[in-house]
Amino acid sequence: MYLENYKRFEAIIDKLREFEGAIIVEGARDEASLRKLGVRAEIIKLSRLPLPEVALIASEYDEVMILTDLDRKGEELARKLAWYLEGYGCKVDTETRRELKMIAKKDIKGIEDLYSLYLRVSLRFWPPEEGI
């Protein structure tokens, strides 16, 4: 990961930490990775519930971020979830996942890898330059 992408990655991590809605992930390891990064938002896991039920639960929040894995299956899940959630009138954030995919797809396969990537790139770019 290059310095420019590192700065964008840091901005995404900050956004995740500050997010106050619900975040939908695929499983427990995804949630664990986000918690290690300091994410305090409500996290809803897809692993045990049908998509319509997950969307109904998430629709209770003003804003919902979809963070499914960065592969084709994750893309399809994100698309379907967004459709259900928009049907409930939710504000849906799929942009964060798209941004993450653009800058980190070569480095990670899924959300469960975010924390380890964060550690690797933080060490690589330490100490930070002024203004990072």
From Swiss-Prot:
Cofactor requirements of the protein: Mg(2+)
UniProt-annotated binding residues for Mg(2+) 2: 69, 71
Domain of life, per lineage: Archaea
Family the entry assigns: Belongs to the UPF0292 family.
Species: Pyrococcus horikoshii (strain ATCC 700860 / DSM 12428 / JCM 9974 / NBRC 100139 / OT-3)
NCBIfam families: PRK04017.1-1
Keyword list, A-Z: Magnesium, Metal-binding
Matching SMART domains: TOPRIM
Annotated binding of Mg(2+) 1, by residue: 26, 69
Domain Toprim stretches: 20-100
HAMAP family for this protein: UPF0292 (MF_01095)
Cofactor note text: Binds two Mg(2+) per subunit.
Protein name, entry field: UPF0292 protein PH1700
InterPro entries referenced in this protein's UniProt entry, alphabetically: TOPRIM_dom, TOPRIM_RNase_M5-like, UPF0292
GO MF term set: metal ion binding
